[in-house]
Amino acid sequence: MSKISRQAYAEIFGPTTGDRLRLADTELFIEIEKDFTTYGEEVKFGGGKVIRDGMGQSQRNYKDVMDTVITNAVIVEHWGIVKADIGLKGGKIAGIGKAGNPDIQPDVTMAIGGATEIIAGEGMIVTAGGVDTHIHFICPQQIEEALMSGVTTMIGGGTGPAVGTAATTCTPGPWHIHSMLSAADAFPMNLGFLGKGNVSLPTPLEEQIHAGAIGLKLHEDWGSTPAAIDNCLSVADRLDVQVAIHSDTLNEGGFLEHTLAAFKDRTIHTFHTEGAGGGHAPDIIAAVGQANVLPSSTNPTRPFTVNTLDEHLDMLMVCHHLDPAIAEDVAFAESRIRRETIAAEDILHDIGAISMMSSDSQAMGRVGEVIMRTWQTAHKMKVQRGSLAGDPARNDNFRVKRYIAKYTINPAITHGISHVVGSLEVGKVADIVLWKPAFFGVKPSMILKSGMIAAAQMGDPNASIPTPQPVHYRMMFGAYGGGLKTSMTFVSQSAFDAGIGDMLKLNKPVVAVKNMRHLRKRDMIHNSATPKMEVDSETYEVRADGELLVCEPAKILPLAQRYFLF
């Protein structure tokens, strides 16, 4: 058999087993663990290439071939970092392996035929679409911004630029929930809405779940008291929905211990389990040590930099309807911004104690920067703390798997949607993001929704080829008309059973959430650590299993000015 050099092979078909890639301008390196191809039988599209009639393309009928094949892609997933062809059929992932013509090629697991489209994955990294579970639906323009960053699922609450929405992620009551479910039809994004959980009697909460809310949000601005927490979790247990909480910063209704006691060991998603986002001051971060708590943090403090503290005070005053002329409001804001706990947040992410990353969109967080901030945090921790125990010196595969799980599979598991989204696995919806390695984590090349291209970098539409400037993100056919049906609207099981889609005449597919109430921290993939936490109420020092968590703020970050003109 003829041979070519490893470099030449990578230039033609992309890297293979043992090759390494640098992720953008970070200090993170991945190494291909396995290549599913058969060497010498690779498929590639183009003039003089393999995927031609009677060669790499078979004569098989539509039902026996893929709708789309992404060829020779590097897949970065919580389950592995591999090279493979990805086959899509009916909007779902139908295969990860070797594509081609099974009539003449060996080891083919996915047939290419006359009904098959090809997306070139050579030299590209492919990931699952991101899942952002901390959305304040303040304006619809957030959705396009998030999509262009690689996020394909948004979960949260709100009704627009009302003060309640600006501060809390709640869509309160059946009328607002139905209105937002109807509005969701217009967007190329999977959407799910959280109702208001701050009620001490069950009926107002049950009404919201039956109306279609996929969960309930407890927020201190509505009063996260032990009574409201207990009632909310009781309703959630009965109706199989998730509860998210932003706890009591001022410790008015109780301290952290009282809130944890109100949980009664029941599953809960704790928002802002972090350094400055809100919740019991100063020790909400200690909740990461609880076996029933599924913790997330938001991107305004990700990662800790020399500018983090300075920008937070003004952001906080605006988001929570505070008045800088009122001393008590200023004191409230200042109590939430703590250098020590922000630094600890970096390390808790790195050891897998904080399980998820999210945005807190327009409510201190930036909706288009969840993925970017995740990888900036991973880079900062690599530089400051070295390789993780599971990584050899030559790659950061385990760290990369840990961090990608924070914005893909773990939030999907937490909110009961991992049976359809959150990872690249056979049978799941084909919400897929393609990246050039030099732009990984910051600027995707193409975003697919249920196998249809919904957004991409695209040049001048009047040019003779697709690449002339200005090249920028543009909506593609999957974002228009019937193409919007490639996105889903998530609802509760009770609303699904009642026929909420037909009742509201929704056009997008309606999918029920499920299997959340049994979850434990151990179910958070690569992010299940439950260290014994201590937070000093005077100095704000944070310890995990007795170790003081300290790190310096970053002065320079990757994925930053190098990639943006403005």
From Swiss-Prot:
Q: List every position bearing N6-carboxylysine.
A: 217
Name the cofactor(s) required for activity, per the record. Ni cation
Question: What does the entry's PTM section describe?
Answer: Carboxylation allows a single lysine to coordinate two nickel ions.
What reaction does this enzyme carry out catalytically? urea + 2 H2O + H(+) = hydrogencarbonate + 2 NH4(+)
Q: Which GO terms describe its cellular component?
A: cytoplasm
Disulfide pattern = none
Where does the record say this protein resides? Cytoplasm
Record keywords: Cytoplasm, Hydrolase, Metal-binding, Nickel
Name the positions where substrate binds.
Answer: 219
A GO molecular-function annotation: nickel cation binding
Entry EC number(s): 3.5.1.5
Q: Which residues form the Urease domain?
A: 129-566
- Pathway in which this enzyme or protein is active: Nitrogen metabolism; urea degradation; CO(2) and NH(3) from urea (urease route): step 1/1
Kindly identify the residues recorded as the active site. 320 (proton donor)
The enzyme class is hydrolase
**Listed GO biological process terms:** urea catabolic process
Q: Which residues bind Ni(2+) 2?
A: 217, 246, 272
Q: Which Pfam families match?
A: Amidohydro_1, Urease_alpha
Which sites bind Ni(2+) 1? Answer: 134, 136, 217, 360
Q: How does the cofactor attach, per the note?
A: Binds 2 nickel ions per subunit.
Q: How does it assemble?
A: Heterotrimer of UreA (gamma), UreB (beta) and UreC (alpha) subunits. Three heterotrimers associate to form the active enzyme.
Q: So what family is this one in?
A: Belongs to the metallo-dependent hydrolases superfamily. Urease alpha subunit family.
Q: What is this protein called?
A: Urease subunit alpha
